[in-house]
Amino acid sequence: MRPGGAADMSRPHQYLPGTFYEVTRRCVERAHKLTPDYARGGKYSSTVEHLYKYATARFAKRYGVEVMAVCLMANHMHEIVFDRYGKIDKFLQKRNAMFANMVKVRYGLPAGIFEKSDGKYNRLEGARPFAKLDDLDGHGGARGGGPTSTGTVLTEKISYVLANPVAAGLVASPEEWPGFVSSVEDLLGKSVVVKRPLEYLAQNDAKNAPEVTFSMAAPPEAIAQFANSAAMLEATEGALQRRIRSARRRHAQRFAGRLRVLATSPHARATSYEPFGRRVPRITTAGDLEAARRLIAEMRAFRKAYRIALEALKAGKRRVTFPAGTGKMHSTYGFPREAYPVPAAA
């Protein structure tokens, strides 16, 4: 596709270093392709969790993406990540392709497992204390209400990810989820060595290492939002427990349970109602109006500058510079972009 063609007509995204994101990726037609499984011998013994960890570790260090929290649900996945170099688009492209291809081979699927859209990744920002839990919607956003000491938007989004199996009515606690869900303690740092899944990647594959290290931790930029790491854990655990209690009340303590989850076919599909055409936010500030106004202004300024550069390119001008944070037009087509803005001195 030539630059300026149909593929570039969608709203451009800006990727800036030092940004937190909530990442969501959904399976096509809400199919349960990521359903929790266990290695039971046979030709394909690697679990979906194993495939996720290998693919993530394979590209995370290269692109400077640091994983803070993860939950693999049956038909979608949630992550909270820190994008150190402004390359989250490249990371997601490479990681998701490898992960999807391995899962596709595992189940003998003729097509990919993820929806064709880029997925959802919300920029997280806003250090103002979050709204009361009663004022939260089902997706961790705020409906209003006064601030409390529950923590920052980052705290609440991490707790939302970790509580997902409970909120969905599947298990009574995150610890009971048979799939992969991280814990609050993982924010202090956790690393595991993951072997190359030989069922999907050849033993003599020079591009993919025999072993990679999958790591999780809160970066210093996250801990800096709190007095110290202990305060971060306390705030996150408190938010998580409030979400769990709220979900238990909502489901009247009736959950599907581990055995029923494990018995779910990877070829089954979710049948619950889902509204069609819901708008997907690109920023989440959770009630911090000052941060929201600033981010919206920055986003509009970026899109305006991008549009001006793109129109100049279409008009025949070849020496075009795109705004800082431009992704595809810079990384794929090689057009220069402005330098990243220098952070203000503290």
Map each language-model feature to its residues.
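Short catalytic/metal-binding and nucleic-acid-binding patches
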Residues: 1-346
